[in-house]
Curated annotation (Swiss-Prot):
Family: Belongs to the PIH1 family.
GO cellular component terms attached to this protein's record: cytoplasm; nucleus; R2TP complex; ribonucleoprotein complex
Subunit record text: Component of the R2TP complex composed at least of RVB1, RVB2, TAH1 and PIH1. Also interacts with HSP90, RRP43, NOP53 and NOP58.
A biological process term (GO) from this entry: protein folding
Main location: cytoplasm
Keywords: Cytoplasm, mRNA processing, mRNA splicing, Nucleus
Region ranges (Disordered): 195-222
Keyword Nucleus in annotation: yes
Highest taxon in the source lineage: Eukaryota
Localisation per UniProt entry: Cytoplasm; Nucleus
Name of the protein in its database record: Protein interacting with Hsp90 1
Encoding gene (name): PIH1
């Protein structure tokens, strides 16, 4: 995630430009007064950081924008950008504040984050609903990284408000952060992500008991490869000895119980039609199996049958005349959530 960590400030600078650059002891910083756009509402599942946040509390994320925030090198074009997103080659930079306390309508304490993007990016997400949904996920991830928390994805809402709170605190960030190569930083974070504790759940590469199912990022062979036993000794035997051994050879032992368990997916499919949008249909596919690995999606489309197949185990008949060109089907995979978004 290409997020920039910063701290909010209480004072606001009332000047016509809405932001001002000042000199700090360790370099120049920029103070940004974000412009409110919309609000994401969810709840806190858990917190692992030094701050003592209470599980189950409501969370509000103010999505805002400013012309000072960097934007991607490539301007948004659906046909160009969505394939780049799938390859982790395009992302909207997000300046994420630390959390602050507030109260909901019932007077209960809640947590608020601010996620600020470039003003051009704000216009892009208004024009493309798929990019908007992707940005929502990026904002959730950015807040999680910022304060070491886990946010709920099952009950996300969008209240009819521009912002949560009386005002949006100004943001302060080093100019070096604003002008750094965020793309290089994004790739570095992606590489580091492979070594985080979650990789144990995804691949269990460090567990000797799961060596039969490695997840090292490589594709399995097309045809089965015979297992080779290393360290076997070479001995000279005759044909009679071979026949004698074959007769006495015991049947192969039954596999251990954990080897018999199959990764059986449990798919939940939701469809939603859109009128007057760039896409006519959105299909949300989520794997609810508790032990399923995050990267077990392999979608394919049969134009003659007008059926969408997932891993060869799930078939989804599509409405007539909804697929004009199979190349126009857009797929976005949120790996950690084991969720597949398909836009037609």
């Amino acid at each position: 995630m290409a997020d920039f960590l910063l701290r909010p400030i209480k004072q606001r600078h009332r000047n016509e430009d809405k932001y001002v650059s000042v000199d700090a002891a360790d370099g120049s910083v920029s103070k940004i007064e974000p412009i409110a756009d919309f609000v994401i509402k969810t709840k806190l599942l858990s917190a692992n950081g030094p701050e003592k946040l209470q599980d189950g509390r409501k969370v509000f994320i103010n999505v805002c924008h400013s012309p000072l925030v960097p934007k991607p090198e490539v301007d948004f074009n659906a046909r160009i950008v969505f394939p780049l997103i799938i390859q982790n080659e395009w992302e909207i930079p997000i300046i994420t504040s630390c959390y602050r306390m507030d109260h909901d309508k019932k007077g209960q304490e809640c947590y608020v984050w601010d996620c600020c993007i470039n003003s051009d990016c704000s216009r892009w997400i208004c024009d493309d609903i798929q990019l908007r949904e992707i940005l929502v996920e990026w904002c959730l991830e950015s807040c999680e990284i910022r304060d070491s928390v886990v946010l709920c994805r099952d009950r996300i809402a969008f209240p009819k408000m521009k912002k949560k709170g009386a005002e949006l605190p100004a943001l302060e960030v080093l100019n070096d952060e604003l002008h750094q190569d965020y793309k290089a930083k994004m790739h570095k974070i992606i590489e580091e992500e492979a070594g985080d504790p979650m990789s144990i759940l995804r691949g269990r590469n460090d567990d000797g008991d799961d060596n039969n199912d490695p997840d090292d990022g490589t594709l399995p062979p097309l045809f089965p490869i015979e297992n080779k036993i290393s360290g076997a000794k070479i001995e000279e035997i005759d044909k009679n000895e071979i026949a004698h051994r074959n007769l006495k050879q015991a049947p192969a032992p039954a596999p251990a119980p954990h080897e018999q368990q199959e990764d059986v997916p449990e798919y939940e499919v939701k469809m939603k039609r859109f009128k007057g949008a760039a896409y006519k249909l959105r299909i949300l596919i989520e794997n609810k199996a508790p032990n399923s690995k995050p990267d077990r999606f392999s979608p394919s489309y049969n134009f003659a049958e007008n059926i969408l197949y997932i891993n060869g185990k799930l078939s989804i008949p599509l409405p007539r005349d909804i697929v004009v060109n199979a190349a126009d089907i857009k797929i976005f995979h949120i790996r950690k959530e084991r969720t597949l978004y398909i836009y037609i």
